[in-house]
Every structure is written in C-alpha cells, then in structure tokens.
C-alpha cells in the first residue's frame, strides 16, 4: 500500500491544534533526535501513540482530538491500525465525515487508485457504511513535478471526482484541498507556494461553503441530525456490579433517549426492569441522547443475567428483539478463497461478537446499484457483494440498516 501520508497529515493536525501536551511533545522530540530521526516529523507523533496503544497502555484519548474554530474533532482511524475496518463497521466509531488522503507524487496517486489500491476500497467502504460527507486532501504537493503543480492537482481532482461519483458521492459537495502534511501547506493556513489555488468550494442543499485550507474544510462539515426521535437502542459494552448501587450496564445511546424511570427491556434475553438513574462522566443525567456513553443503574437484575452485546430499548416503544436468522447485504473485502453456503465465521455487530452461519447465499448484486446480477450463486469471493441469509449460533439483536444504522452494520472475521 502506497503511503499517502495519512499519519503525517493527522499527526500535524493533532500536533498543531490538539490534545498533545508540551511535555509529551518534548519527550517525543528528544527521542526522535536520539534515534537519529533528525528533524522531528508529525507521523512520529502518531507512531508513538499507536505503539503505546498497541502495548495496551490506554492513552489519554484527548490525544486523538483536536479543535477547530467550530468543532472538537475526534480522529477515529489512527491510519493503518489493523482494526480500523472492523471498528468502522461495528460502529465503535461512527464517523460524521471521511477525509480521503491521496498522494500527488508521480506514480503514487496511480498506485493508490489502481484497481486494487486502498484509496478506492476506503472510499467505497466509507460510503457503504453511511459516511456521506467527504473531504479530499491531495497530499505531498511538495513532491509533484514540478513541485506544487497546478496541473497535477487538477488531474487528480478530475480522476478522484469521477470515481467517487461512481461510488455515490456528489463531487460538487466535496472539498478538494491541495496540501503538504509534511510542510504544512494549506493545513491550517493558506500556502504561499500555490498562488494558483483560489480555494475550495462546495455546494449542497444546506448551503455553500468555501475556504483555502484543510482545517476550514473540516469546519464546513454539517453536523449530523442525532436520531433522538427514534426508538431507544443502547448496545451494552459492559455490565458492572457496583457496591451499594447494584447492577450498572454501560454503553452508548445509538438512537432515542434514555432517562430515569424508563422501563427498559434487554434483547435478546427479554429481561425487563426499571432504570433508577443514568450517569455520564460521574454526573447524574436527566436524559441521555445519541452519542452519550453512559452507565445506568437497573433494579432487580443481576450482573450474571446481562452481557456485552445485549441491547437495551424502551419496553413500551418499538422494543428490540433477538433474531433467529436475518437477511443482509454482505460485501467480501479481503477473504482468501471462495465462500459458500455453510460458511460460519464470527460476526461483530455493534458490541456483539457471535458465530453466524451463511445459511443461504441468495443472490450476487452490483456493489454500487444493489441490482441483482446472479441468483443462488454457488459461492462468492473477494470484491463480491451478495444478499445472504445468516443464522446466528444464538439469538442476536440486529436491526434494519434503514431504521437503526448502528445495529444494521456488521463485520465478519
């Protein structure tokens, strides 16, 4: 995979606008010098954070955030992290916007966008998973021929526009920004090296926006409507027993509202109980809304009866239920060999982790249009999309993607 400079770009933003304290930076800079990394580079920041995270040192999550004039931005993909795709699909991390970084260097862009390049795969995946806002950073403008070449930028913009359009994005609503994550051109302020660049501009039904640099493009993201009007769905991440309080399930409200007094049902176990109190960051809440990570105390239910992967809902309003089987659209990303009826992988859906059998592969479909291309195929392979009937080894709480997206997405491992 060609390195498009995601880490450097991300590192630069975190470094300049973000949550890394002075002490940590000085420590990193010193280490970089000792290791002969000479000039301290932004990707190094990210490498350090990733290494610490992979060793199981929980890093202060503030490190993965930075601020713009308008938003707190949380970086979900520490690029190259092996669980990225799984995390993206299971919605442990649902993004509001994707930033696609393509390398402008000679040959680099072509490799990334080639038939099996990762640029394509990531853009398609983002769209398929419902990340409908996109920004394109045309990176490494310092290494074009000649450096900071307008014609190279325009060539890439044209090519990327045409293929994101095929995927389903509207290029007119996508900001294309020529940048150098290494030197900082057009990252936080307009570059003097590209006088030809008059700025990016986007048009969408919610209005127009324009600007010069990447950080302004992030500021122009439209905040998504949080689904408070839908029925409550809260997948459990953990369940604790807390002395003097009792049983406390913990998870993120995906849709609807949770408040004290709600009579909740836990699916698929079908256990019903009253919510006594709701807490976030050690403070009592009168109501929790989508996006809130909360703990809530429930009456007369023991820790043993609940588990990660169960889903809490309101017993009186469209409650969740377990499914003995379900039909889903499956896209095969990277799987060696053929998959046929009877294949039983482990499925990750919201917080549930459970073996599921491909009971019947009903049809192959076109990944972009969803139109059927073959009925009852013998098998499917990497790159294929299919409609499959799945049977979980024990009941699983899934929902239609249309109604409850976070509970209608899954990854198969």
UniProtKB/Swiss-Prot annotation:
It is found in: Cytoplasm. CDD domains: EF1_alpha, EF1_alpha_II, EF1_alpha_III. The modification 5-glutamyl glycerylphosphorylethanolamine is found at residues 287, 360. The keyword Transcription regulation does not apply. This is Elongation factor 1-alpha. Keywords: Cytoplasm, Elongation factor, GTP-binding, Nucleotide-binding, Phosphoprotein, Protein biosynthesis. GO terms for cellular component: cytoplasm. GO terms for molecular function: GTP binding; GTPase activity; translation elongation factor activity.
